[in-house]
């Protein structure tokens, strides 16, 4: 700890008795040696709990208040700011004897005070003898509220934010012997040693041996095929043509039969005149579906030349034969290559 750090007495009183300053000089003689001074901060309530001391400038702080509840987390955080790492802190204030209706609204219990100290980062809390000379505020001395002056000593940790320190570990070797790292020093492992991060007093983990579950090979196993029912073994039924997505035409690789239904429907829509002498008002009907409008009767048909007969599959060809009286009288008609053969 630096030699120039001092001791701070903080209070909400207008002035501290001389006996309190003498007590501080006697108890912190080691910290006041080497040119360090004893400083007094009065009326901390009026200064909004802001201390004029610099950051990490005090080796010890003694906060003596006569108003209950002044040691709030915000004020204790300000005290931690002015304390050096490892500095001592004594807080003293009137506390409630036990949890009860608070007529003095700011009063808190000893447990609440210790909780505030822990939240502010202080450690090593212990109750010490109170400093004589600081009494309870008269505004809170009512017969219905039991208040006792209590002093709690604590210290600021010796490490700062971002500090790195070693964690004590337990080391075991192949022989089962254990050794520790001593006073939190790094452990250097030798060959065959392992590090155990569990606390020294922790119980060993329970080991579960599952290998015995597979030693008996004679046990009867369940055939997964026996779990299948007749419904599971049935082939799935393909959806009907109506189950296709609501598109204008069948899919490119249609397998549900919709393409055939559309072709039949298209063939039945064409009249004899449209088959024998196809015409087009737009001139694009014979170029294919890419050039046909949505209402074109030739949608789905292959390309053809306007003014020539349209042949689209066996059904359309059969319809065309039935519509021509002369050919229908010839009897059986077969199509071989590009020749039309009719039996009289």
From Swiss-Prot:
A motif (Cx2C motif 2) lies at residues 293-296. Its main location: cytoplasm. GO terms for molecular function: 2 iron, 2 sulfur cluster binding; 4 iron, 4 sulfur cluster binding; electron transfer activity; metal ion binding. GO terms for biological process: iron-sulfur cluster assembly. Its cofactor is [2Fe-2S] cluster; [4Fe-4S] cluster. Residues 170-233 are annotated as: Linker. Residues 244-256 are annotated as: Fe-S binding site A. [4Fe-4S] cluster binds at residues 282, 285, 293, 296. One of its GO terms (cellular component) is cytoplasm. It comes from the Eukaryota. It holds the Pfam family Anamorsin_N. Keywords: 2Fe-2S, 4Fe-4S, Cytoplasm, Iron, Iron-sulfur, Metal-binding, Mitochondrion. Residues 282-296 are annotated as: Fe-S binding site B. Residues 1-169 are annotated as: N-terminal SAM-like domain. A motif (Cx2C motif 1) lies at residues 282-285. The keyword Iron applies. Component of the cytosolic iron-sulfur (Fe-S) protein assembly (CIA) machinery. Required for the maturation of extramitochondrial Fe-S proteins. Part of an electron transfer chain functioning in an early step of cytosolic Fe-S biogenesis, facilitating the de novo assembly of a [4Fe-4S] cluster on the cytosolic Fe-S scaffold complex. Electrons are transferred from NADPH via a FAD- and FMN-containing diflavin oxidoreductase. Monomer. Belongs to the anamorsin family. The C-terminal domain binds 2 Fe-S clusters but is otherwise mostly in an intrinsically disordered conformation. This is Anamorsin homolog 1. It comes from Physcomitrium patens (Spreading-leaved earth moss). The lineage of its organism: Eukaryota, Viridiplantae, Streptophyta, Embryophyta, Bryophyta.
């Amino acid at each position: 700890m630096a030699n120039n750090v001092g001791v701070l007495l903080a209070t909400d009183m207008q002035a501290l008795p001389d006996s309190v300053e003498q007590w501080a000089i006697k108890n912190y003689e080691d910290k006041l040696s080497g040119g360090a001074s004893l400083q007094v901060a009065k009326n901390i309530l009026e200064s909004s709990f802001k201390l004029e001391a610099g950051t990490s400038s005090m080796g010890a702080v003694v906060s003596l208040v006569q108003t209950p509840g002044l040691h709030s987390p915000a004020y204790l955080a300000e005290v931690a700011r002015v304390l050096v790492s490892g500095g001592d802190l004594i807080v003293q204030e009137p506390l409630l004897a036990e949890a009860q209706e608070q007529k003095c609204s700011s009063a808190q219990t000893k447990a609440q005070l210790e909780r505030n100290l822990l939240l502010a980062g202080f450690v090593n809390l212990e109750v010490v003898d109170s400093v004589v000379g600081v009494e309870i505020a008269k505004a809170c001395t009512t017969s219905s509220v039991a208040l006792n002056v209590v002093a709690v000593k604590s210290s600021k940790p010796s490490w700062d934010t971002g500090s790195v320190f070693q964690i004590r570990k337990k080391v075991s070797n192949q022989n089962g012997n254990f050794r520790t790292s001593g006073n939190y020093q790094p452990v250097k492992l030798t060959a065959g040693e392992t590090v155990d991060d569990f606390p020294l007093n922790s119980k060993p983990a329970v080991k579960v041996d599952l290998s015995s579950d597979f030693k008996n090979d004679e046990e009867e196993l369940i055939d997964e095929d026996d779990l299948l029912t007749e419904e599971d073994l049935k082939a799935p039924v393909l959806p009907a043509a109506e189950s296709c997505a609501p598109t204008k035409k069948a899919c490119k690789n249609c397998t549900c039969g919709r393409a055939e239904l559309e072709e039949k429907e298209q063939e039945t829509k064409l009249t004899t005149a449209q088959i024998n002498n196809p015409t087009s008002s737009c001139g694009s009907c014979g170029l294919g579906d890419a050039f046909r409008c949505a209402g074109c009767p030739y949608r789905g048909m292959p390309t053809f030349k306007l003014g020539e007969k349209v042949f689209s599959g066996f059904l359309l060809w059969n319809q065309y034969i039935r519509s021509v009286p002369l050919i229908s009288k010839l009897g059986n008609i077969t199509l071989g290559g590009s020749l039309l053969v009719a039996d009289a």
